[in-house]
Amino acid sequence: IRLATNERELAWMRYIEGFSKIIGFDMEIIPPEEILRHNPFMTLDGVIAGARTTEDGHADPSGICNALAIGAKNMGAKIVRKNRVTGLTQLPTGEWDVETEKGTIRAEIVVNAAGCYARQIAQMAGIDIPVTNMEHHYVVTDPIPAFKDRDEEIPVMRCPHVSGYFRQEQKSGLIGVYENTGLAEAWAPRGGNPEWDSTSELFPEDLERIAPWLERAIERMPIFGEVGLRRFVNGAIPHTPDGGPLLGPAVGLKNFWHCCGTSFGIAQGGGAGKYLAQWMVFGDADINMTEFDPRRYGPYADEDYSRAKVFLDYRMTFTTRLPGEEEPDGRPQKMSALYGRLLSAGAVYGETYGWERPKYFALDGAEEEGGYHRTNSFDAVAAEVKAVAERVGVLDLSGFAKYDVSGPDA
């Protein structure tokens, strides 16, 4: 259940509910009293509604990985553990020699599913990808007496006010925090790259950094505050600039695919593997993969851009974004010669494939308001449409795709 504490968050839930019905995803918006029926231990100060996904839950990541591995073996896959890749070389045939500590493997296709190591693997193949590893905390409490007498668990709860999630972990409580101040890149002294011999590496907890959000979680779930904190876990999670995974063919390489940048990890694992496999085998997937295609990024998405956008994505994990809202982080990257002139004339810019493109002109100088209904951009856009329809307009096409078509029948 995700909580809404204002109309902005409720509007987003209604938007999600709309297309959930179209695709057959089971979700409902429930009132506060219904939330309490599912989780009677909460305080709902300021909560106006909740989005309940009836088929969701939580699972043990290790158990899921083992189940997937067993299933793969049953279908003929061979798994070699504790065998580090040391190099990648593409042959004239398009095949790859994958050099490992236990010998070289000749592969028709390579899939980069290396998690926090994905960028380093990509660099072995001669390319780079916009992935930044972030530190992320979760905390486990001591056993909670109120949970011991219950046969059912409370739902996983997500709360923008907490900027995190909380749930039951056996008979204890678990709080995960996405702090929006004092963020830390994992392995920052090493350029964000883990050591090759690192396995399941954890970092020292930073209680001061996450304390304000833990306090908010305890305000929502007072029974968490009745016991001690038993365990702090601070680990690494890879993120991409827009928060979506990299699933698809690598830019500029043949027979090299990405399956990485999944900031929600094992929760995305089954779907990522299924649809990527369809794409690889049949040339297409059952769903539109455009939002995940690694080719959505170009050379502009360098290390600095990736870091700026990933920090933004992390700190806004529980912030509701509305249509029309654009953040300045990592911008501008690509500008036409008219950028400054149009900006001084009131252009409101959006970012597309790294390009700064005017969306409309705010003659009153007001910033664009986001929303699902008419906003302050409506009248300005209407006036521009009328002007072009009745007279003439000039459009800067620098940030749009161009196609060079040549040949006898062009």
Question: How would you label these PLM feature ranges?
Answer:
Residues 125, 139-140, 145-184, 205-208, ...:
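Mid-domain catalytic core of redox enzymes
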Residues 100, 104-153, 287:
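Central helical "cap/lid" subdomain
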Residues 8, 41-47, 89-97, 239-243, ...:
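A short, glycine/Asx- and small/polar-enriched loop/turn
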Residues 1-38, 161-166, 170-176, 201, ...:
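Dinucleotide-binding Rossmann-like beta1-alpha1 core, especially the glycine-rich loop
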Residues 161, 170, 184-188, 197-334:
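C-terminal catalytic lobe of FAD-dependent flavoproteins
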Residues 287-288, 294-410:
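Glycine/proline-enriched, intrinsically flexible loops and inter-domain linkers
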Residues 1-2, 36-75, 97, 192-201, ...:
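Helix-loop-beta segment of a Rossmann-like dinucleotide-binding subdomain
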